[in-house]
């Protein structure tokens, strides 16, 4: 601004109407420091892709220290490995063995949920945890198969390929999907594109996980009721139809055993939730249930054949599966699509779980490192007969409560799984399928977070609607389409916020120089002759026309209000641009056009406090020159005071 910085004026106060000599200090609105196009681009790229400034720790370091810091950055195990001692090892061994007791039955159960051989679930609880222990930055994340990713993979692949009639092709697609999931996850981390997963909003995930939990629970009726011929579809209607259409296959022995062990598992879960110190009861109950139920089936095997069991599981380490990866053929697109969707879901869950427990212990989990760790873990897993894995909330909670100190607990868990694979597999021969169904039911029931849904209803109705779209989409359409519907609704919400931003009318709070929304503050009052508006978003091509029309409507409504109340003629419209973080050429054109149209109505347009980049573009586009000497101010208070004194000096009412 070109006008002076201090004036003494004889003016009327906008608050009480009394006249007096008041010092009005008018501050200039400055342009930001000049920068080259390259400097601007460099800063913008840094803000978008490197908000955490990962190279900061390397500055002012010797080459030797930089190499050490680089190794610690790539392999977090070097950060805490040098300080590892027997005390930490004891805690990690206890927690590792504890989560192993949960991981073994869950691994077998979740593999069946993905329509894969049970042994694949154990393979997936061996190799991935070892890789995560080296690459992961979370101390408490317990890695392995999870219910949601297993369900999504099973439902998407089985729509095109039968897991029973074409089991080899199905297995190939599962491993290939895992490979592409890993590539996608690692790429997000390497390219620092983690913000892409933010399109899965909290509301979307609440509805999706709840809907998936219901579908998973209903699918377990096959095992709980002893049904042999069951639908492979995942929607609620065909699942329930299959349950009642095959009533003749219901087995009372299976039902009794299922209800009994399900009651035990739910009771131990409830006890552990009420008294966290008794976490070990809930952690040990799945394995204990597997052992007891296996013994029961073994003892009564000659008296009844109604209870189905797992059967033979091969002993030995993970066989290599690199030769089974499917990189050409009719189903490649299906493998890629399944990999991306399961990759996004597992990545979202893993990072969320890791950050949850990191916040409890006051340390930080690096999101990009986690993406790379989980991605490389799944890529390696796909070559060693594993399917999609990530951090499990239930296992991580047990790991945390058991006193885990570092990622060594994952190594201990993997070692326990290794012993199981090498020596204990024949013991699972008579493990009944009904106990696996009960374990899955107990695990997924906690995914139905009705309290979070109620909070959405109380806080944000649109988020609640998104949650419902996700929930019912999964239940009645399909798992991937339900997720897609919810993401589409979330994107529509973003578009609405961008294309139809909020504008509000400001007034003065008496006795102060504070201007706030008339709708929020009842004591705020209008200033005669002024219409003060605040724009609460960037001005882009998508909303520039809307904002122009909305501001002109504000002006018409204000003039009509003045006529009805015989008030002071409207002379000036002030736009508070404090919240306008950016503007493009369409926005600049809209501001210029708005000034021209208001000028025809004998109304002055004044801009207040544009931020640096906006101010720079206003200056370069000559809009500042067009607005004139009194068209730009630092605060609303200064604008009102200066313009009022100018009008009074010119004899205007």
Curated annotation (Swiss-Prot):
One annotated GO molecular function: symporter activity
Gene Ontology annotations for the cellular component aspect, listed alphabetically: plasma membrane; plasmodesma
Occurrences of domain STAS (ranges): 520-643
Parts of the chain on the Cytoplasmic side: 1-92, 137-140, 189-194, 269-279, 353-370, 429-433, 493-653
Coiled-coil regions, chain positions: none
Membrane-spanning intervals of the chain: 93-113, 116-136, 141-161, 168-188, 195-215, 248-268, 280-300, 332-352, 371-391, 408-428, 434-454, 472-492
GO BP: phosphate ion transport
Family: Belongs to the SLC26A/SulP transporter (TC 2.A.53) family.
Protein role: H(+)/sulfate cotransporter that may play a role in the regulation of sulfate assimilation.
Designated name of the protein: Probable sulfate transporter 3.4
Upper taxonomic lineage: Eukaryota, Viridiplantae, Streptophyta, Embryophyta, Tracheophyta
